[in-house]
Amino acid sequence: MINKFFSLPLFLLISFSAFADHPKEDVEKWLAKMHHASHMINYDGTFVYGQNNEMTSMQIIHSVGKDGELERLISLDGSGREVIRSGDTVTCILPDQKSVVVDKTRPDSEFPPKFPLKIEQLSKVYDFHFGKDGVVAGQKAIKLMIVPKDEYRYGHTLWVDMKTGLLLKDHLVGKNNEIVEQFMFTQINYPESIDKERLLSKGENKKYTWYNAKDFDSKKDASGNMSWKVESLPPGFVPDIKRHHNMTMTDMPVEHLMFSDGLSSVSIFVEKQMKNSKNLIGGSTMGAVNAYGRNIGNYHVTVVGEVPHVTVKMVGDSVKYIDR
């Protein structure tokens, strides 16, 4: 899938007495079933994705066989955009930009979204509750609510296919129980097999410009001996990724750090300021994604993630460098 690009939630104050409480083992059972279904079964369906009062329809074809895990996402908005995933390689075909981008998949960009299998650490910053069962895309679904204990992360309301375990619907929930992002299958099938031809893109064009994301030698990083650190993180967030690489379409070197609580994550990008560059200063919001930017000396720092604004600002303001 194409990489995606608030105050204390009021719903934390709501009594959960009406919800059916289940042991931790039941929650983990369903998370494991979701994980298995998203990677280990064939499915073919149509879903809608929405944010900022805008909805987009997409078709997904997912196959597991002798060639491993293959997936094709097709935009139904007329743009011709497609995403092909084969193992851990993702190819994005963008006809409107006459380009093809090849990258490695990351857990935070997978569809359906990837959820942790164990909740011991998550339980420190989230509560888990089962709600009333429902029906999504004609399938009976169990309802699972993941509720944050503070203002630094969003919650999730999940509807999971009772038979297969596939995640059929997800509401990303912010303050005042506001839905900041959502997806929902409108039609779903589980075929025994899928013709490989259906997983091949019809939109690739040799005249398109191809971009291959490649990590580069960190010794060549523009920041030299300078090391970056984050002095203040929300509870539960720990280091997840630290790497140096070139920006896919500009080839500019950037240092990338990611912190995660196991469900929510924030990424920090540090790059050398370029002359006449229009860098983000302050905050920006696009649906569930918040970003915050500031300059530190000759460098620009951008923090971005599917987390509330208070989180990216807290992290961004605490980024420091040590000149060794």
How should these model regions be labeled?
Residues 55-59, 78, 152-156, 168, ...:
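Short, surface-exposed coil-to-beta transition loops
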Residues 1-7:
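Bacterial N-terminal signal peptides that target proteins for export
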Residues 2, 12, 16-69, 77-79, ...:
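N-terminal leader/targeting segments and the immediate start of mature chains
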Residues 40-44, 66-72, 138-145, 166-169, ...:
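Short, hydrophobic/aromatic-rich segments at coil-to-beta transitions
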Residues 137-206:
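Gly/Pro-enriched, hydrophobic low-complexity segments
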Residues 107-156:
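Intrinsically disordered, low-complexity linker/loop segments enriched in Gly/Pro
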